[in-house]
């Protein structure tokens, strides 16, 4: 918590920067930095049927449309295009006007602008002790749609045809346009004083004074480009925040318990089809770096989706869906691990890393650590299943594969340019670099490892359980 002096200084700064905050839902910013364009594979228009609106929602829908008109988000249209409206309830029970843009999206040339990796975004917060999360007031609606492309956004309603002047949700390239906007606005501040992931902006600092300066910098930049924040959604001067499905603090990163809580509900109703299992594994996989040996645990479940380790669906049709006791144990173990995950530490690239590796007959395991204040902190876990060919490797070659995969693939971003101590329970692996008896493929793997600075040490298998 802030002391009395800090509160006064924070209030004074917020008062100076009050123009960055929207005063109500209709108080939208309008950026001059980018416009959203819609390039189509062919310009031939289409017209979809107006969908029926339940009579009880008609009056509410009309009010919502009028609000959009008053805000300048939409205007009446004579467009030859027409996409149907979909009405959705918000969390506060008010009506959101959405549009089914699937037909338009199918004709849209995709924008390849990259969206940041979640892991990179979170790791940029290393060393920070204070955080502020900023949320834009209907962020997409602060971006203009190019005038020539506005007719393509036309929506058909019981009250007529309207087109968007601002970028609506549902357009296939809207996320790319918004990420481009935010990175342009905060270009020299991104990853230095704040991180940007779509409409999530996190300002981070080591102390209050630094935060005050950084926050004002970000506010000034948003004002410069005509963007406004939603005050109720902004969290300022926090020591612990929720960000991208995780909880972030000075101690490290952990899964957001509110996000993983639904996993417990799955215990009462295990997946009954391949589709349900894919949904579960997709959700669980988002947090796989928190689970030691995720791939090995999930292997019985993965086998239900593919007939073999290699996904050759044409040669090997999908097996029948039979939920065995082995599947149930794997399912329960994953849920238990995900709902009691460790806090992962932030990497410090000024310190060496410690990499524990191991290989079994089914998969590879790796655990990345660093020592800080005489304590060993987990940075990340990694694992993957072996292919059919890899399962035929000798034990030594599987360990060599685990070394190459762990350093040159899984944790490359951490280990390139930093010292790494590799711990293995394979004694022959410790003689790898000096051995004269290497096959041509061994030499290729060794060449891939050459740019990395690592030392291999041996530890007996009984005390080597963390990478298994």
What are these regions (language model features)?
Residues 17, 37-38, 68, 85, ...:
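Mobile genetic element proteins and their domesticated derivatives, centered on retroelements
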Residues 19-49, 57, 88-96, 113, ...:
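Reverse-transcriptase-like RNA-dependent polymerase core
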Residues 4-25, 49-80, 112-125, 130, ...:
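Inter-domain linker/hinge segments that demarcate the starts of reverse transcriptase
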Residues 192, 197, 223, 232-351:
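C-terminal reverse transcriptase regions that engage the nucleic-acid substrate
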Residues 279, 285, 392-468:
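RNase H-like nuclease module associated with reverse transcription
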Residues 1-113, 194-198, 205, 245, ...:
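Reverse-transcribing Pol proteins
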Residues 88-96, 104-111, 141-144, 182, ...:
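Catalytic palm subdomain of template-directed nucleic-acid polymerases
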Residues 105, 160-177, 268, 318-319, ...:
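A short, polar/acidic, helix/strand-boundary loop motif
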């Amino acid at each position: 918590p802030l002391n009395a002096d800090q509160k006064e200084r924070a209030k004074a700064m917020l008062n100076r920067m009050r123009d960055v905050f929207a005063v109500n839902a209709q108080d939208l910013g309008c950026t001059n930095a980018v416009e959203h364009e819609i390039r189509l594979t062919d310009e031939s228009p289409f017209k979809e049927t107006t969908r029926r609106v339940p009579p009880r929602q008609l009056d509410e829908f009309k009010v919502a449309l009028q609000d959009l008109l008053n805000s300048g988000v939409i205007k009446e249209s004579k467009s030859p295009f027409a996409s149907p409206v979909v009405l959705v309830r918000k969390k506060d029970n008010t009506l959101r006007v959405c549009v089914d843009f699937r037909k338009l999206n199918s004709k849209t040339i995709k924008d390849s602008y990259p969206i940041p990796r979640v892991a990179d975004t979170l790791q940029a917060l290393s060393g920070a002790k204070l955080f502020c999360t900023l949320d834009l007031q209907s962020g997409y609606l602060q971006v203009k749609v190019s005038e020539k492309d506005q007719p393509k956004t036309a929506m058909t309603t019981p009250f007529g045809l309207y087109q968007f002047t601002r970028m609506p949700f549902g357009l296939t390239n809207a996320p790319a346009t918004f990420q481009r906007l935010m990175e342009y606005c905060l270009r020299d501040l991104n990853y230095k004083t704040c991180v940007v992931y779509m409409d999530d902006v996190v300002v981070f600092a080591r102390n209050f004074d630094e935060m005050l300066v950084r926050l004002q910098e970000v506010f000034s930049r948003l004002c410069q480009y005509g963007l406004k924040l939603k005050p109720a959604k902004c969290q300022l001067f926090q020591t612990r925040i929720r960000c991208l499905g995780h909880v972030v603090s000075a101690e490290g990163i952990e899964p957001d318990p509110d996000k993983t809580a639904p996993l417990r509900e799955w215990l009462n109703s295990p997946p009954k089809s391949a589709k349900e299992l894919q949904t579960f594994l997709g959700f669980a996989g988002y947090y796989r770096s928190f689970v030691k040996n995720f791939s090995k645990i999930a292997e019985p479940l993965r086998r239900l989706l593919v007939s073999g380790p290699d996904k050759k669906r044409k040669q090997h049709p999908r097996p029948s869906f039979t939920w065995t006791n082995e599947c149930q144990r794997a399912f329960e173990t994953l849920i238990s691990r995900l709902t009691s995950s460790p806090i992962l530490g932030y990497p410090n690239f000024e310190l060496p890393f410690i990499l524990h590796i191991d290989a079994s007959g089914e998969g590879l395991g790796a655990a990345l650590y660093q020592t800080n204040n005489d304590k060993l902190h987990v940075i990340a876990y990694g694992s993957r299943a072996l292919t059919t060919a890899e399962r035929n490797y000798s034990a030594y070659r599987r360990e060599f594969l685990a070394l190459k995969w762990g350093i040159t693939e899984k944790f490359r971003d951490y280990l390139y340019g930093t010292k790494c101590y590799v711990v293995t329970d394979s004694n022959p692996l410790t003689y790898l670099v000096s051995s004269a008896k290497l096959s041509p493929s061994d030499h290729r793997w060794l060449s891939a490892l050459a740019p990395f600075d690592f030392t291999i040490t041996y530890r007996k298998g009984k005390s080597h359980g963390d990478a298994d």
